[in-house]
Amino acid sequence: MKKMKLRHIIIAALCIISTSCVKQKLETTYNSQENRIDQYIEKNRVVGGDTLRVVYNDGSSRLVTKEGEGPELTANGNIAFHYAGYTFSGSFSKSNLFVTNRVESATESGWTLTDEGSQILTINMNDYRLLPGLKAGLIGVKGGEECQILFTGKYGFGNKEFGIIPANSALLYK
């Protein structure tokens, strides 16, 4: 009986240790992704002598490549936009495209879009389809603004694989 209890205690302890190690590894992965995002922003922040504006919001980083005009998008507002989503591993690569409605991005990556596939997306910011990192990155954009929004896997698809996107992948949206 004592051996049985001891065995259960050891198994429970091993499970706790294993879970703790997995969580620590995941946090290390996200910290590494945050560092790569910061390095990417620093490397791409100055263009033609001009310093681009960077906005940080709830785990998301927005590098503004063209300023917009008018009122800022709110957390409950509606937005209509073209986009291209890429997995991000420290640098931008056209081959990492996983979704787009931008003809230019599709063409650059060797994709073909139908007329329907290139339609501008109109969506409410509370729509469940928006990833937390994308939503946080869009808050505050103005009409006509062009930007890159980057965030870790924690604010993307998390530990779920999604189509061709590996679990816990950092993402970049243009």
Could you describe each region identified by the protein language model?
Residues 1-21:
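Sec-dependent bacterial lipoprotein signal peptides
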Residues 5, 21-174:
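Cross-family detector of peptidyl-prolyl cis-trans isomerase
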